[in-house]
Amino acid sequence: MAPAPKLINWKRNLFVAWLGCFLTGAAFSLIMPFLPLYVETLGVTGHQALNMWSGLVFSITFLFSAIASPFWGGLADRRGRKLMLLRSALGMSIVMLLMGMAQNIWQFLALRAVLGLLGGFIPNANALIATQVPRNRSGWALGTLSTGGVSGALIGPLIGGLLADQYGLRPVFYITAGVLLTCFVLTLLYVKEQFTPVQKKDMLHARQVFAALKSPKLILSLFVTTMIIQIATGSIAPILTLYVRDLAGDIHNLAFVSGLIASVPGVAALMSAPRLGKLGDRIGPERILVFMLIVSVLLLIPMAFVQTPWQLGVLRFLLGAADGALLPAVQTLLIYNCTNQVAGRIFSYNQSFRDIGNVSGPLMGAAVSASYGFRAVFCVTALVVLFNAVYSWWCLQRRPTRMREDTLQEE
């Protein structure tokens, strides 16, 4: 018989998982500043072709991740989450190494697709911690864990740009592979999991997974919420620099100001996520989720009417503070309303919806701005988030009032 789960030092696992998410977030964002430049070195010429290929190599990773996530989630429920962390870190390390050796754009595109197939360190880390931490500490733990990937993604572009200037483009891929290999070694040595493998014949099928849930409709609504959160975040990304230029006029440090305004939401999320997660443990993650969605709407609307970049920067900082609570609240509600037996698949389905949002958001933002202008993007995004707030509130109201208390008592 497996040892009692209480023997797991979940706080140490949380620390190592946070470090792994930080390294993974940094590794992925290391290459982002010069991705179009690398595409150009692979033989792509012309403004239109460069834009098309840059968009393809960026989005194909998310598309293939959305396809592969449910498979890896099922394997996590059968073989354990630590194995999935190791598989993801090592697989991504090898692919990053090969990316640095790519000789043409087709090889690079194929490797970006494989990267999506083999990814998933952060969602698997979320599933591992969510199934180990005491339920009454879930909000704080998942909020804290979310800061790992965010902080890595914030520092990655800065370091990646410096490394590319110093050593060239290809060596950055080799350095990134080394970072991911470090993540693999740390996970192998220090993450502990007590998991009894499940035979394939004993596994629940996808339909049975949802039938076994306390509230399948609620879980589906949380998936949709995750997708809309990513759509709202991504819709602004394609037009942000151009919007800042419209607000600022001809300034010599446009790239710096745009980068600063792009990064302030992440800084705010770092500060707010653990605190709001802890508050959610006290008052309920459902209240945090709905309230912060409404706050996001109230911050998005005035962004359409700002007159200076600094006004936009302040509003985006406040928006980041609100957004920092959203995904941890969703993940906490997911673990409240599913069993450990199916947690891997539930989190993987959620990751698929997140990837769909990552692809759809920039497309929506680009389409709206092309037709109606930059300011309309913020209004349309606010409407989408408002729908999400109302939809989430409605679904959470239909949940049995004792559901959360019953889930807590199971621990």
From Swiss-Prot:
Q: Which organism is it from?
A: Serratia proteamaculans (strain 568)
Q: What is this protein called?
A: Multidrug resistance protein MdtG
Is Transmembrane one of the keywords UniProt gives this record? yes
Keywords attached to this Swiss-Prot or TrEMBL record, sorted alphabetically, are:
Cell inner membrane, Cell membrane, Membrane, Transmembrane, Transmembrane helix, Transport
Family the entry assigns? Belongs to the major facilitator superfamily. DHA1 family. MdtG (TC 2.A.1.2.20) subfamily.
Q: Which GO terms describe its molecular function?
A: transmembrane transporter activity
Report TM segments.
Answer: 14-34, 56-76, 89-109, 113-133, 144-164, 171-191, 219-239, 254-274, 288-308, 376-396
Localization, UniProt? Cell inner membrane
Recorded hits in Gene3D superfamilies, A to Z, give: MFS general substrate transporter like domains
Task: Tell whether RNA-binding is among the UniProt keywords.
Answer: no
GO cellular component labels: plasma membrane
Q: What is the lineage of its organism?
A: Bacteria, Pseudomonadati, Pseudomonadota, Gammaproteobacteria, Enterobacterales
Q: Which CDD domains match?
A: MFS_MdtG_MDR_like
Membrane topology listed for this record: Multi-pass membrane protein
Q: For this UniProt entry, what is the primary localization, expressed as one broad class?
A: membrane
InterPro entries associated with the record: MFS, MFS_dom, MFS_MdtG_subfamily, MFS_sugar_transport-like, MFS_trans_sf, Mutidrug-R_MdtG, Tet-R_TetA/multi-R_MdtG-like
